[in-house]
Regions:
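A general structural motif
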Residues: 1-3, 37, 99, 148
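Hydrophobic, aromatic-enriched interface-forming segments
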Residues: 140-160
Length: 170
């Protein structure tokens, strides 16, 4: 029998998009597939620090995280790709030019551009979620040592952002 490999996303695949629950049936199926000699991986857009321990406790063989920027197998890091500071600064400059919201993510931290406040409702919701989890988001984006693994930009041409209207979006 040949070994097969399966990849599972977290959000909306392993867990319910409604309440984040993880069904026992999924845990049992993954463990049975491993017992049958197959490799089980998480493949998520989340960076490593955002993968909750409950997922790793299932017994996955490895994880591809950060949209492919970080790969672990057998408890060892095989690959990590990050964007250098100069690239982060170029992205930040372009995002600010179009007046969009951005979050930069890495294995260690999550940083939002707070220079103009967060206006997009989805970005604001994510910021509040990370804040409630007590993430340290205080590292200055412009610091010369700052790099990131990936970034997300929110730009909605349907929303007219003003400082007064942004408060009404929540």
């Amino acid at each position: 029998m040949s070994t097969k490999i399966a990849f599972f996303d977290i959000d909306g695949t392993l867990t319910s998009e409604v309440d984040g629950s993880l069904p026992d049936s999924a845990i049992l199926a993954i463990r049975q597939a491993r017992a049958n000699g197959n490799l089980m991986f998480i493949n998520t857009g989340r960076c490593y620090q955002n993968v909750e321990p409950r997922f790793m406790e299932i017994g996955f063989d490895g994880i591809v995280c950060g949209c492919g920027t970080n790969i672990y197998y057998g408890g060892k890091e095989l690959m990590h790709v990050h964007q250098p500071h100069e690239v982060v600064m170029e992205i930040l400059e372009q995002v600010r030019k179009v007046d969009a919201d951005v979050v930069f993510e890495s294995r260690e931290e999550v940083l939002f551009d707070l220079s103009r406040g967060i206006r997009n409702p989805a970005a604001k919701k994510l910021y509040e979620e990370f804040k409630s989890l007590h993430y340290d988001m205080s590292h200055p984006l412009e610091a010369e040592d700052y790099t990131c693994d990936k970034f997300v930009v929110w730009y909605d041409t349907c929303l007219l952002y003003t400082s007064d209207a942004a408060d009404d979006l929540t």
